[in-house]
Swiss-Prot record:
GO terms for molecular function: eukaryotic initiation factor eIF2 binding; GDP-dissociation inhibitor activity; GTP binding; translation initiation factor activity. Belongs to the eIF-2-beta/eIF-5 family. Pfam families: eIF-5_eIF-2B, W2. This is Eukaryotic translation initiation factor 5. The keyword Nucleotide-binding applies. The gene is EIF5. Catalyzes the hydrolysis of GTP bound to the 40S ribosomal initiation complex (40S.mRNA.Met-tRNA[F].eIF-2.GTP) with the subsequent joining of a 60S ribosomal subunit resulting in the release of eIF-2 and the guanine nucleotide. The subsequent joining of a 60S ribosomal subunit results in the formation of a functional 80S initiation complex (80S.mRNA.Met-tRNA[F]). The keyword GTP-binding applies. Residues 179-188 have a biased composition (Basic residues). Residues 290-449 form the W2 domain. Residues 143-233, 263-299 are annotated as: Disordered.
Length: 451
């Protein structure tokens, strides 16, 4: 298939990357039924990123003839016998008016239709918005048959969420790899220090044995020298308490030696202390009554809150919280309520900052749309028992979770409508009203733009 550059002004540019197929036409029929068939109109329209019906209709408007494009078969027909060069010239005019950016000339544009029924071209290369001349005949056809809009809203949000999850998993893998490297380095340093201590102990043992050698050995000097030169000599370590203490004093510094605690003296002191019949030492303690106060066992819900706080104790990760929540056998709503109480219990002013700070843990608890409803209901339940200062920040918290792709606008609006329909007059619902109204107005504006 022969290709040519898009736009007459770029015809001689050998390195121009925007190309389209060269037009192929075919004359069909005779007499009054003669028609011109643009054989590859579908391929040309794909290259221009415009519907094939637009180009076909433009030929009909400019030639004053009837034109028709069949969506099922992809056949483009214009009444009358028309030369290929003439149709190609009209196509260049169409490209200049409805495809190329008026600012940079690139064909990477998208047709936009405003509320006031004005057509404009938005350039993806430079961002320039070009206003189309509304006096042209084709504009009426475009307004009646607007181009298909790209998938937005939920699909975009789902893509962003999937991308964030992918980045989080990558960061978690990197952190785990760094931790393994650190552990390996620590282990290597410990092994090296242990080898150094062992070497010092060996040299100290040798010096001890040199000092404690017998007089007979000093008389046999030649024999001892011969023994030192022998490679098969095996040194033995003196395991007596005195030798061990001496080695400790030689190897450890004064500061370290004070930290070493020998348990032998303490055990001897304890053995010497007299024990009375009542089990007390030195008569200082009195008899402990056998009747111990009954300890109330915490409920499963309180145990879950305790487990969550324990998992968030030192170097917490979202995966740890996810494992704790997955292991719980409580109802789903209780499982969702527990993280809020564990994370934000007792928080007053600054509730929103805490939510933004810990939103990664909330994101783990909300894997799907059903869990979003549970989270909104958990916020409502938490608002009934939280600090009044935190209660005022409920709408800001909802917006923070909405901006963080943890809650969708549909979930928030549906929850609010259900609460109002059920006659709930809680302060959480009242405080959330301005934010819900803002969501609804923004949604209606988007629908107006689409129309």
């Amino acid at each position: 298939m022969a290709l040519q550059n898009i736009g007459a002004s770029n015809r001689d540019d050998a390195f121009y990357r925007y190309k389209m197929p060269r037009m192929i036409t075919k004359i069909e029929g005779r007499g009054n039924g003669i028609k011109t068939n643009v054989v590859n109109m579908v391929d040309i329209a794909k290259a221009l990123a415009r519907p094939a019906s637009y180009t076909t209709k433009y030929f009909g408007c400019e030639l004053g003839a009837q034109s028709k494009f069949d969506e099922k078969t992809g056949i483009s027909l214009v009444n009358g016998a028309h030369d290929t060069a003439k149709l190609a010239g009209l196509l260049e005019v169409f490209i200049k008016k409805y495809v190329q950016c008026y600012g940079c000339g690139n064909p990477e544009t998208e047709i936009l239709i405003s509320k006031t029924q004005m057509i404009s071209l938005k350039c993806a290369a430079c961002g320039f918005v070009s206003d189309v001349d509304m006096r042209d005949k084709l504009t009426t056809f475009i307004l009646k048959n607007p181009p298909e809009q790209k998938k937005g809203g939920k699909d975009k949000k789902a893509m962003r969420r999937a991308e964030k999850e992918r980045l989080k998993e990558g960061e978690a893998a990197d952190e785990e790899q760094k931790k393994l490297k650190k552990d390996a380095k620590k282990k290597g340093s410990k092994d090296s220090t242990a080898k150094g201590l062992k070497k010092k102990a060996t040299t100290a043992t040798g010096s001890d044995e040199d000092h404690s050698s017998s007089p007979t050995r000093s008389h046999d000097g030649d024999k001892a020298a011969a023994d030192d030169d022998d490679d098969d000599v095996q040194w033995q370590t003196d395991t007596s308490i005195e030798a061990a203490k001496q080695r400790m004093q030689e190897q450890l510094s004064a500061a370290t030696a004070e930290m070493v605690m020998l348990s032998t003296e303490e055990t001897e002191k304890k053995m010497k202390q007299p024990t009375h019949k009542d089990g007390s030492t030195n008569g200082s303690a009195k008899e402990i009554p056998n009747d111990k106060p009954a300890v109330t066992k915490p409920s499963p819900y309180e145990e879950l809150i305790g487990d969550i706080k324990a998992s968030l104790g030192s170097a917490p990760t979202p995966s740890q919280l996810k494992a704790v929540l997955a292991s719980s056998t409580l109802p789903p709503q209780d499982v969702m309520n527990a993280p809020l109480e564990a994370l934000f219990g007792g928080v007053g002013k600054g509730f929103t900052k805490e939510v933004v700070k810990n939103k990664k843990y909330l994101a783990v608890a909300v894997p799907d749309e059903g869990a979003q409803t549970l989270l909104v209901q958990a916020i409502e339940a938490f608002g009934g028992k939280c600090n009044p200062e935190a209660l005022k920040e409920v709408p800001v918290v909802l917006k923070a979770l909405y901006d963080g792709d943890i809650l969708d606008e549909e979930t928030i609006v549906d929850w609010y409508n259900d609460a109002v329909a059920a006659g709930k007059d809680s302060q959480v619902v009242k405080n959330a009203k301005p934010f819900v109204e803002w969501l609804q107005s923004a949604e209606s504006d988007e629908e107006g733009d689409d129309e």
